[in-house]
């Protein structure tokens, strides 16, 4: 921790306060913490999530954690729908055993599934879904399909359950109940390459543009590297088909010019895959995104489409997720930023602090700004909140504590902006606003200027 005197120019008599803050370079204890420990530390400080032994391996997202979780999903839905042509579906959490037998999961993945038995006379066995692909196959096969519908892209954000061993559970990185930005593409052989390249483009947007993770390797231009995972010992389907699928992925990798290495025997039981790997601050690697090429499930579900020559042909299925587990992605973000969220993702976007909590003019000016930025309606107002409007996470600290204490508290919580209101601000009708990462520079802005500034930050993912 550092302690320094900060002069807040917020009244005619300048106010001096001690400011306590974490330096950007972590302390020795923080820098040696595992991602799970770092996640727990930040969560406690920012009230992000909790766990309970009554539901091991499941996460309770508290309001601040839910804001981050939902914002990540909102971001991904926008990219998938309006940039890459996905249509979102919502599918059941539980299916009969017969579905999992058909897909091959019951034979190859049963140990990792939660099984449920009904209490009726039939005592039929069900399974909680560990992945969405069989459900998406049911949607594709529900009606006749034509070649001009392809590529057909489904996305799904519903929760998944996997029966991880209790000893393997670890914070947000290894859970029994989690969410993925899951998606499946049904396409023709001639469309496979362009669809996989588009999946890699979205991965580049996420890992090289929006979220600056630790570099994926020594001197790497990309923040990630790719593991090319090939046929495992236990697999379904024909060996010749597997060899063809692996050759297709290898050619795409070589053409992409991206860093990759062979990971023999670690493919999915239904097809080879490209696993996107990032490193945490301890240089340990974690799988996040994945792209999988599958010739097997379309065969097992007898999926087909009518081609231009009126013959029926089998589509190829591409499984892909960009965040991978959203919970794990959040853990790696925390490991990378230590709770210093970018403004658009921050549950603590701004805090408004009056110098004198007894001063009516200062309080009025503070509450007016908070109401404007939060953009909330009163409960007795019969008008609904408009869709697609801006709402910022802005708090007002009017605790009966010295202003220096409240400033220190805001800094420790990593608010993106501190907005101070004193006598001078009341006189000028401008707010004293300071960025989290710039402790020496202040701006005097009007309410409308702050509103426009925050909109620009969110629009540009800053």
Curated annotation (Swiss-Prot):
Catalytic activity: tRNA(Thr) + L-threonine + ATP = L-threonyl-tRNA(Thr) + AMP + diphosphate + H(+)
GO molecular function per UniProt: ATP binding; threonine-tRNA ligase activity
InterPro entries found in the cross-reference section: aa-tRNA-synt_IIb, aa-tRNA-synth_II, aa-tRNA-synth_II/BPL/LPL, Anticodon-bd, Anticodon-bd_dom_sf, Thr-tRNA-ligase_IIa, ThrRS_anticodon, ThrRS_core
GO biological process: mitochondrial threonyl-tRNA aminoacylation
Location(s), subcellular: Mitochondrion matrix
E.C. designation(s): 6.1.1.3
Keywords annotated in UniProt: Aminoacyl-tRNA synthetase, ATP-binding, Ligase, Mitochondrion, Nucleotide-binding, Protein biosynthesis, Transit peptide
Top-rank EC class of the record's enzyme: ligase
Cystine connections: none
Transit peptide residues according to the UniProt entry: 1-45
Cellular component terms per the entry's GO annotation: mitochondrial matrix; mitochondrion
Coiled coil: none
PROSITE patterns registered for this protein in UniProt: AA_TRNA_LIGASE_II
Family annotation (PANTHER family): THREONINE--TRNA LIGASE, MITOCHONDRIAL, THREONINE-TRNA LIGASE
Family: Belongs to the class-II aminoacyl-tRNA synthetase family.
Other known facts: Present with 1240 molecules/cell in log phase SD medium.
Protein name in the entry: Threonine--tRNA ligase, mitochondrial
């Amino acid at each position: 921790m550092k302690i320094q005197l900060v002069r807040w120019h917020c009244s005619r008599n300048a106010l001096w306060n001690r400011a306590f803050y974490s330096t950007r370079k972590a302390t020795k204890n923080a820098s040696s913490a595992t991602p799970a420990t770092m996640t727990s530390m930040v969560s406690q400080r920012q009230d992000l999530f909790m766990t309970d032994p009554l539901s091991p391996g499941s996460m309770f997202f508290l309001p601040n954690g839910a804001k981050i979780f939902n914002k990540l999903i909102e971001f991904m839905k926008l990219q998938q729908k309006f940039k890459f042509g996905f249509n979102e579906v919502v599918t059941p959490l539980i299916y009969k055993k017969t579905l999992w037998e058909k897909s091959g999961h019951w034979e190859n993945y049963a140990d990792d599934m939660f099984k449920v038995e009904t209490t009726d006379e039939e005592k039929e066995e069900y399974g909680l879904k560990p992945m969405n692909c069989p459900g998406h196959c049911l949607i594709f096969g529900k009606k006749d399909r034509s070649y001009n519908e392809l590529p057909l892209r489904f996305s799904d954000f519903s929760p998944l359950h996997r029966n991880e061993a209790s000893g393997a559970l670890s914070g947000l990185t290894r859970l029994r109940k989690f969410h993925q930005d899951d998606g499946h593409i049904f396409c023709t052989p001639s469309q496979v390459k362009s669809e996989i390249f588009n999946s890699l483009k979205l991965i580049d947007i996420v890992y090289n543009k929006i979220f600056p993770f630790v570099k994926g390797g020594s001197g790497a231009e990309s923040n990630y590297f790719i593991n090319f995972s090939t046929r495992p010992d236990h697999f379904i389907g024909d060996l010749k088909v597997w060899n063809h699928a692996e050759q297709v992925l290898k050619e795409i990798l070589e053409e992409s010019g991206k860093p990759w290495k062979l990971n023999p025997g670690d493919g999915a039981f239904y097809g080879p895959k490209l696993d996107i790997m990032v490193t945490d601050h301890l240089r340990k690697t974690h799988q996040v995104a994945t792209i999988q090429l599958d010739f097997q499930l379309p065969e097992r579900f007898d999926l087909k489409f009518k081609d231009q020559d009126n013959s029926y042909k089998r589509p190829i299925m591409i499984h892909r997720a960009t965040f991978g587990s959203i919970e794990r992605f959040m853990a790696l973000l925390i490991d990378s930023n230590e709770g210093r969220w970018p403004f658009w993702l921050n549950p603590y976007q701004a805090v408004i602090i009056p110098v004198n909590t007894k001063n009516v003019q200062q309080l009025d000016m503070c509450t007016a700004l908070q109401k404007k930025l939060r953009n909330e309606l009163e409960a007795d107002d019969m008008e609904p909140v408009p869709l697609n409007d801006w709402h910022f996470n802005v708090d007002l600290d009017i605790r009966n504590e010295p202003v220096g204490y409240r400033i220190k508290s805001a800094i420790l919580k990593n608010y993106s902006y501190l907005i101070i209101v004193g006598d001078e601000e009341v006189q000028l009708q401008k707010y004293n606003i300071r960025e989290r990462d710039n402790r020496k520079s202040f701006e005097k802005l009007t309410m409308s200027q702050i509103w426009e500034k925050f909109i620009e930050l969110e629009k540009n993912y800053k």
